[in-house]
Regions:
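Substrate-binding clefts and catalytic carboxylate motifs of secreted carbohydrate-active enzymes
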Residues: 42, 49-56, 68, 273-277, ...
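Generic beta-strand/beta-sheet core signal
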Residues: 10, 173, 210-211, 233, ...
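Active-site-proximal loop/turn and secondary-structure-junction residues that shape catalytic pockets
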Residues: 157, 214-216, 236-238, 280-283, ...
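Aromatic- and acidic-residue-enriched segments that line the glycan-binding/catalytic groove
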Residues: 20-29, 224-229, 244-256, 291, ...
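Secreted/periplasmic carbohydrate-active enzymes, especially glycoside hydrolases
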Residues: 1, 5-6, 10-217, 222, ...
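The substrate-binding groove and active-site-proximal loops of carbohydrate-active enzymes
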Residues: 46-50, 178-191, 199, 203-211, ...
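A short beta-to-alpha transition loop/helix N-cap that caps and shapes the active-site region
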Residues: 14-17, 241-242, 287, 323, ...
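Short hydrophobic/aromatic-enriched beta-strand-loop microsegments
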Residues: 227-234, 332-338
Length: 468
């Protein structure tokens, strides 16, 4: 969960997890009974995020058995020339054999040993749809144990002001999401995941940002198979409290943040859909700029160090005075959350476009690829106005129409992640009427007018070569 949780077997603690929403587990001999355990004390804190923090078990609990010697982990690092570096971690000394299977289950390469390099002849590359998200399987055996790891062969890199996938300039057409549904909150639902992925395809989108935490592993498996790009984000949300509190001095977060980042990368390292790591969402980078840099830049370096595929790394920023931010400009891709026309310059789209362009001129000077990692407008489904007034479906269309036109003028602007895929629940408050209504779909997945506009827009934007 987003808060601390503990796993007990027969009332004995065997594992715990402190808010990374990734995974945790433990070796155990015997037949267990598993129950959720509450902390002895419920600390009073100051949460700073805009989604409902559900409690309970959200994702599958799996009990499995292994031989005495078994495979603990597999790492796959493929290259577009067909060479594949692999490493198999085992608990013993039994010999390891690996075989690469193609999408039809045919063996195309094999090797012996816990690590090495093998070559796939006439390799098929993984690409997002409408390309082919081709998947291979590394079939590893160690004694009696078997481990199958799917992988895709693709490259991802930043070169100048472009993001290149398999050497081709990429444009992200994406949604920010939440694990949330009207019937069961954040509870894992494989059927809903299939529904959402089909809607992503229907919308002519190609990407998802896992705002603001790592999602269930099964969602990444689905994105691998369905050819959807993923910006994978840690649960570091809203670190900051304004000018009165320096979070980098007041809160002991750094060590835990390093652990959470390492666990996310370890879990998701083999997914071809994951093309970008996000260190966190909307921290305070403005009031204590040097302390912020000293906190975040080591995490940036750690992500590059830990990722065997060395994907690009970013940090999603949201500052009133972006000129004071000395951290975002050091990331591989500049990702900005901005609400011109909504929270800022509310309802005045002429002024909103002017403010956006003033800021984009600033980021152009950094000579980095730039993406809008969040932007949106609360929209009440069924609310219509003669003019494009705030909260109406007409305003949502006008909001995206005007801002998107500004993005298209700039060759170094490489993507847009709209906020949000669907309406979702939040804590109650004077700014929220039954949750956040910025979804392009309602909470039960019905499209608003803004979604029909974006569907048409994205149909006209190719995944590759849009701004060549």
């Amino acid at each position: 969960g987003l808060v601390g949780s503990e796993m007990c077997i027969r009332d004995r603690p065997v594992g715990n997890e402190d808010g990374q929403l990734a995974f945790f587990g433990s070796d155990n001999a015997g037949i267990p009974s598993v129950e959720a355990a509450k902390r002895a004390a419920a600390p009073q804190n100051r949460p700073n995020f805009d989604f409902f923090n559900y409690a309970g078990i959200h994702r599958p609990v799996v009990l499995y058995t292994t031989p005495k010697e078994y495979i603990e982990d597999v790492t796959v690092v493929p290259a577009v020339d067909g060479t594949v570096q692999y490493a198999v971690k085992t608990t013993g000394s039994a010999p390891v054999h690996v075989t690469v299977l193609d999408a039809d289950g045919n063996a195309v390469a094999s090797a012996e040993g816990t690590e090495g390099t093998i070559t796939i002849p006439e390799v098929h590359l993984w690409e997002p749809r409408p390309g082919t998200p081709y998947l291979y399987t590394l079939h590893a055996t160690c004694g009696a144990d078997v481990y199958d790891q799917t992988f895709g062969v693709r490259s991802i890199e930043v070169r100048g002001t472009q993001v290149l996938l398999n050497g081709k300039p990429l444009y992200f057409k994406g949604f920010c999401k939440h694990e949330d549904f009207t019937a069961h909150g954040r509870g894992f639902d494989p059927v809903l995941n299939v529904k959402d992925v089909n809607l992503i395809h229907w919308a002519n989108a190609n990407a998802v940002r896992t705002s603001h935490y790592p999602y269930a592993e099964e969602f990444y498996d689905l994105c691998d198979r369905e050819g959807i790009l993923v910006m994978d984000e840690t649960p570091a949300v809203g670190i900051g409290g304004g000018a009165a509190v320096n979070p980098y001095k007041e809160y002991p977060l750094a060590e835990h943040h390093r652990q959470v980042l390492a666990e996310m990368i370890h879990r998701d390292k083999n997914h071809p859909c994951v093309v970008l790591w996000s260190l966190g969402n909307e921290p305070d980078l403005e009031h204590f700029p040097q302390d912020a840099y000293d906190y975040w830049h080591p995490l940036y370096e750690l992500a590059h160090q830990l990722d065997p595929q060395d994907r690009p790394v970013t940090l999603v920023c949201c500052q009133n005075d972006y000129t004071k931010d000395i951290t975002t400009r050091t990331m591989d891709i500049v990702c900005i959350n901005r609400y011109y026309g909504w929270y800022n310059l509310s309802g005045d789209m002429d002024a909103a476009c002017y403010g956006l362009n003033q800021e984009l001129d600033f980021w152009a000077e950094q000579h980095k690829p730039v993406m809008m990692s969040e932007y949106g407008a609360d929209t009440v489904a069924g609310l219509h106005t003669a003019g494009a007034e705030m909260f109406s479906e007409e305003f949502q269309v006008e909001f995206y129409r005007r801002l998107d036109a500004e993005f298209d003028k700039r060759p170094w602007f490489v993507g847009e992640f709209v906020w949000n895929f669907a309406d979702y629940d939040t804590v109650q408050g004077p700014m929220r009427v039954d949750g956040n209504k910025k979804g392009l779909f309602t909470r039960d997945r019905r499209p608003k007018l803004g979604m029909h506009f974006l569907r048409q827009r994205w149909a006209e934007i190719p995944t590759f070569g849009f701004k060549e």
